[in-house]
From Swiss-Prot:
SMART domains, alphabetized: RPOLD (SM00662)
Pfam families referenced in this protein's UniProt entry, alphabetically: RNA_pol_A_bac, RNA_pol_A_CTD, RNA_pol_L
This enzyme's EC code(s): 2.7.7.6
Transmembrane stretches, start-end: none
One GO term (biological process): DNA-templated transcription
UniProt protein name: DNA-directed RNA polymerase subunit alpha
Domain-level remarks: The N-terminal domain is essential for RNAP assembly and basal transcription, whereas the C-terminal domain is involved in interaction with transcriptional regulators and with upstream promoter elements.
UniProt GO MF annotations: DNA binding; DNA-directed RNA polymerase activity; protein dimerization activity
Record has Transport as a keyword: no
Protein's organism: Geobacter sulfurreducens (strain ATCC 51573 / DSM 12127 / PCA)
Residue ranges of the region described as Alpha N-terminal domain (alpha-NTD): 1-233
Top-level division of the source organism's lineage: Bacteria
Length: 340
């Protein structure tokens, strides 16, 4: 079976711009990707971040003395419609999954903000300074709001509860903890080649989830959704080990052979020599990206080496513990002298 996915260049880790990182903003870099993968993955992550992450939001409100959203409240500057608009801007974090009821009770003049919402330990207000209403000395405002966990945008009609008390007004809810996502794709260099992609991803949240976790959740969602398209069991990576006689350590003697025995082209052989690679084990320990960074080492040389290693049951990027083993080196040298 062709191992198409192993022949592609991919990043080894996600880099974070620590200087600008906060609980609400993060800037991330990943490189190198094969040409086109930066846009493919950047767009996919952006769409999932904006649409599919769970968050908390207010789904309905009941105001004492109010039967519908087109009413006004004595002593309150804002009408009910404007109060509902302001409630949509309240950012919350829930530590459970069950719906919760929160309240506002206010008498007399003053400005009501999200910090005035009475909650229990399961609900946290993330923007307590957010404006909700302005009251005069004659005001007597009592409100009950239902907070739920959900994802994406849910219109008021879907938040309607037939069992709710009379006067309950369903409202649109934006559950997503993500406020904004940007991504850009620029050129990345691997060795002498500059036609790879560098993905830069910027994420803004409401503070209920940190940007690093948001990106991780989005990637996990994509991974789960794509898994159904894989119709085979992936083969285990070659370990570079082979069983030998009883009482001996399992080794693959090819790892201790000189790279000169690979009979590479002059260009490839010189590149390995300049990189200080003497043994095949040292070669297979290098990743494709590391090899392409070697001076004058290009895709043609890479493919040549990969083909020869494949014939030996080896690949680039292998993890070899305890290599080289001095005891094995001495034993193999002794065997070769005996053969001579």
């Amino acid at each position: 079976m062709y191992r198409n996915w192993r022949d592609l260049i991919s990043p080894k880790k996600l880099q974070v711009e620590s200087e600008t990182l906060t609980n609400k903003y993060g800037k991330f870099y990943a490189e190198p990707f094969e040409r086109g993968f930066g846009t493919t993955l950047g767009n996919s992550l952006r769409r999932v971040l904006l649409s599919s992450l769970q968050g908390a939001g207010i789904t309905s409100v009941r105001i004492k003395g109010v039967l519908h959203e087109f009413s006004s409240i004595p002593g309150v500057t804002e009408d009910v419609t404007n109060i509902i608009l302001n409630l949509k801007g309240v950012s919350l974090k829930m530590y459970g999954t069950e719906p919760k009821t929160v309240r506002i009770i206010h008498k007399g003049d003053g400005i009501i903000t999200a910090g005035d919402i009475i909650t229990d330990p399961q609900v946290e207000i993330l923007n307590p300074e957010h404006h909700i209403a302005t009251c005069s000395k004659d005001a007597n405002l009592e409100m009950e709001m239902v907070v739920k966990v959900g994802k994406g945008y849910v219109p008021a009609d879907r938040n309607r509860d037939e069992k709710a008390p009379v006067g309950t007004i369903p409202i649109d809810a934006l559950f997503s903890p993500i406020r904004k996502v940007n991504f850009t794709v620029s050129n990345a260099r691997v060795g002498q080649m500059t036609d790879y992609d560098k993905l830069t991803l910027e994420v803004w949240t409401n503070g209920s989830v940190i940007p690093e976790d948001a990106v991780a959740f989005a990637a996990k969602i994509l991974k789960e959704q794509l898994s159904i398209f894989i119709n085979f069991d992936e083969e285990a990576e070659p370990s570079g080990e082979a069983e030998v006689g009883e009482g001996e350590s399992p080794i693959n003697e090819n790892l201790y052979r000189s790279v000169d025995e690979l009979e590479l082209s002059v260009r490839s052989a010189n590149c390995l020599k300049n990189a200080g690679i003497k043994l095949i084990g040292e070669l297979v320990s290098r990743t494709e990206a590391e090899m392409l960074k070697t001076q004058n080492f290009g895709r043609k040389s890479l493919n040549e080496i990969k083909d020869i290693l494949a014939e030996m049951g080896l690949t680039l990027g292998m993890k070899l513990e305890g290599f080289p083993d001095p005891e094995v080196m001495r034993r193999l040298r002794g065997e070769r002298k005996d053969e001579e």
